[in-house]
Amino acid sequence: MDMFQGDIGKSVVEVLERLCCEIDSPEQQICCGQPAYNSGYVKESKNAMKRMITAFEHADYVVSPSGSCVYMFKEYPEIFKGDPLWASKAKALAAKTYEFTEFIVHVLKIEDVGAHLEGKATYHTSCHMTRLLGVNEAPIKLLQNVDGLQYVELPGKDRCCGFGGTFSVKMGNISGEMVQEKVHHVEETGADYLIGADAGCLINMGGRIHRQGKPIKVMHIAEVLNCR
């Protein structure tokens, strides 16, 4: 997040601080290891995972603005099941890790963060976040309580945008057709904003929207909730 979309990370911090959370972002944290692991670099990815486990060992909660990364954290215990020490540490990390909107709604018990944004918005439900983490209602509740924002459901909302991490590289033609279909559905809503909760999906859809010159602003939900 700090490498590609720093504004999203900044928004996450500012929103949570307004909700009275004390934020710490350990300098030793790196990638969660998912791209390397999914590409077959198991040994290398485990080194990254161990570093992440250690970095967040003393945190009360770990919050991420990416359902994909959170799901990877949840997979750590299974990945380290042959190593009792690291499996135990991985299990502890997984238990306290939450997706950003999930944390706000289900842990902090807040559905209105006092955000304001004028316009019409639709929301893309990313695959890992909804299908694997089961985080479905939290982001919608938060968006519906943004003052001035009209929420419109996205047709075919349960369909993948075509990113899928390395899928978009390995299966470029198929990925391109999938994201084009998604952009078409976004246009059908007449939305001013396309909102999502996973950076990969937003980069994929945002790139296609930009190249086609569509008048639609792509935003991460953290940026929306940080609007005043």
Swiss-Prot record:
Gene Ontology MF term list: oxidoreductase activity
Pfam families xref list: CCG
GO cellular component: cytosol
Highest taxon of source: Bacteria
InterPro entries: Cys_rich_dom, LutA
Biological process, per Gene Ontology: lactate metabolic process
Sequence similarity: Belongs to the LutA/YkgE family.
Role, per record: Is involved in L-lactate degradation and allows cells to grow with lactate as the sole carbon source.
HAMAP family from the UniProt entry: LutA
PANTHER family: LACTATE UTILIZATION PROTEIN A (PTHR30296:SF0), UNCHARACTERIZED PROTEIN YKGE (PTHR30296)
Protein name: Lactate utilization protein A
Source species of the chain: Lysinibacillus sphaericus (strain C3-41)
Gene: lutA
